[in-house]
Each structure stands twice: as C-alpha cells, then as structure tokens.
C-alpha cells in the first residue's frame, strides 16, 4: 500500500529526567501541565502533532488530554534524536509521509500560533531546508545562563549556537536568543 502524503508533522520531544529540572513536562502552569500547554498551542496550526517521550507518565498525560503520543528509546542523547525515531515510527504507524517536520521544544508553554506560521512561511522558498526562530537581545536583563544563543550571517543563515551570549561586548551584548529547535524539510 502506498503511503499517503501529508504536509506538516510537529513533534514535541519530552523526557521526564531533564538535566536541569526533573519532571518539567508534567509541571503545572495554572490548571494544565507544561506539555499540555505546548501541545494545545500548536495543535490548530499543524496537520499532525505528537509528543515523543521515553516516559510512561508523560505518555499517559498526553493521552489523558486526547493528544497523540509515541514511546521512544530512553537512550537518545538529544530531543532531535528522539524526533528522528518518532518520525519513522509515526510515518509507519500512520502510513503517511511528511514534507515538513517541526521539532517543538516541550518547555515552550507560551509558543504561539504566529511563531509556527512564521516558520511555515520560511518554506515557501523551496530552497529552504531548515529554519529556526530567534529574537534579537539588546537588554542585559534578558541574558540568562543556559539559554541558547545564535550568531547569524548577513543573509540570516545561522553560523553557530552557544549556551553563552555571543558575541559578547562587556558594555552591551548583542545576541539572538534561539527560541525553537531547528525545523527542516523532511523527504
């Protein structure tokens, strides 16, 4: 049977044993968990959405609010690795292939539909293979340890990413904060 072609799959990698904050996806923000906020904020924009997790508690939480979830291997070193496994499992399970796959951070409960539309618009140019969201930082108060920063060239191509503000000017850093994992065209 030939696989049905569909356009956009969003994957939210989520693990319970986070290095910086254990159990983060299940932490409550108001009356919902963080993972539910992220999921619901993305659900109306993407054709397909799922949480890729290695933890039964997260899986059960997602199923509890009628979301899609898939169990992945605990050995993954990154969320991107978890997404890659999830793509293959989900495409096989759903008998579909996807032209775009979004890796959506599970700890971005305030992600907005506009952010996703902005990413989708990047792919109107068929040459685009990968895109990421970032905002300019110009206030010292916005700089925090552990955030991901990026340097881009004059054509908006990311040159490199760092967990430290880059480039650093003692008087006024000028960095971009990376606010989303890369999104790429998937074939």
Q: What does each model-identified segment do?
A:
Residues 4-53:
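N-terminal glycine-rich phosphate-binding loop and ensuing alpha1 helix
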Residues 13, 131-133, 161:
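Short glycine/serine/threonine-enriched helix-capping/active-site loop
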Residues 43, 88-92, 124:
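Residue-level signal for alpha-helix termini/capping positions
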Residues 46, 96-98, 127-129:
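Short, high-confidence coil segments that cap the C-terminus of an alpha-helix
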Residues 50, 56-104, 110-118:
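Short phosphate-binding loop-to-helix
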Residues 113-139:
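Conserved donor-nucleotide/metal-binding helix-loop-beta segment in metal-dependent transferases, i.e.
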Residues 136-176:
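Anionic-ligand binding region
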Residues 177-187:
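Single conserved hydrophobic/aromatic residue that forms the stacking wall/gate
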